[in-house]
């Protein structure tokens, strides 16, 4: 019965957020438009706020690009999200 449940189940918000973050990190070339970053910010905060009380006004999210010695460019999503409390405790 668990097998059939796993075939028809929707991904959890945690899994969706994780997949979105992976896509951002994979996108290591090119610029990310500010409107896309804002949309990512909104969606991440929506998922996180289901589990944690956060200070939305103090959230900082940015994308940093770095180059290494071999000329490879990498990007990192940096999120500073102040936590008020964990829900369900």
Swiss-Prot record:
InterPro entries from the UniProt entry: MinE, MinE_sf
GO BP, sorted A to Z: cell division; regulation of division septum assembly
Pfam families: MinE
Keyword set, alphabetical order: Cell cycle, Cell division
HAMAP family reported in the protein's UniProt record: MinE (MF_00262)
UniProt function note: Prevents the cell division inhibition by proteins MinC and MinD at internal division sites while permitting inhibition at polar sites. This ensures cell division at the proper site by restricting the formation of a division septum at the midpoint of the long axis of the cell.
Family per similarity comment: Belongs to the MinE family.
NCBIfam families from the UniProt entry: minE, PRK00296.1
Listed name of the protein: Cell division topological specificity factor
Lineage start: Bacteria, Bacillati, Bacillota, Clostridia, Eubacteriales
Protein's gene: minE
């Amino acid at each position: 019965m668990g097998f059939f449940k796993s075939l028809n189940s929707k991904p959890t918000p945690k899994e969706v957020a994780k997949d979105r973050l992976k896509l951002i990190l994979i996108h290591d070339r090119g610029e990310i438009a500010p409107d896309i970053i804002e949309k990512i910010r909104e969606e991440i905060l929506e998922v996180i706020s289901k589990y944690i009380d956060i200070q939305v006004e103090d959230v900082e999210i940015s994308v940093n690009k770095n180059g290494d010695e071999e000329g490879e460019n990498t990007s990192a999503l940096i999120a500073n999200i102040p936590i008020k409390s964990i829900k369900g405790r």
